Amino acid sequence: MLLVLAIKTLVLGLCMLPISAAALGVGILFAGYNIAVSRNPDEAETIFNGTLMGFALVETFVFMSFFFGVIVYFI
């Protein structure tokens, strides 16, 4: 029983790794937004809409990974 709990804890820890990758991805995404707006300020609204869609996609994968880890840990 202790081995199963240890494996579940490791799986939960491994499912937290995409959170750090998502933080890096969001930073790169908004850095690209800043560069794009500085080069073409007239298209700032269009670029921002695409940036928000990318942000939502990244966060979706983070939440899926987190909930998968929680489900594995508690079931």
UniProtKB/Swiss-Prot annotation:
- InterPro entries, A to Z: ATP_synth_F0_csu_DDCD_BS, ATP_synth_F0_csu_sf, ATPase_proteolipid_c-like_dom, F/V-ATP_Csub_sf
Q: Which Gene3D superfamilies does this one have?
A: F1F0 ATP synthase subunit C
> Which residue positions hold the site described Reversibly protonated during proton transport?
59
Transmembrane stretches in the record are: 10-30, 55-75
Q: What binding partners and quaternary form does the record give?
A: F-type ATPases have 2 components, CF(1) - the catalytic core - and CF(0) - the membrane proton channel. CF(1) has five subunits: alpha(3), beta(3), gamma(1), delta(1), epsilon(1). CF(0) has three main subunits: a, b and c.
Described function: Mitochondrial membrane ATP synthase (F(1)F(0) ATP synthase or Complex V) produces ATP from ADP in the presence of a proton gradient across the membrane which is generated by electron transport complexes of the respiratory chain. F-type ATPases consist of two structural domains, F(1) - containing the extramembraneous catalytic core and F(0) - containing the membrane proton channel, linked together by a central stalk and a peripheral stalk. During catalysis, ATP synthesis in the catalytic domain of F(1) is coupled via a rotary mechanism of the central stalk subunits to proton translocation.
Q: What is this protein called?
A: ATP synthase subunit 9, mitochondrial
Q: Which organism is it from?
A: Paramecium tetraurelia
This protein's encoding gene: ATP9
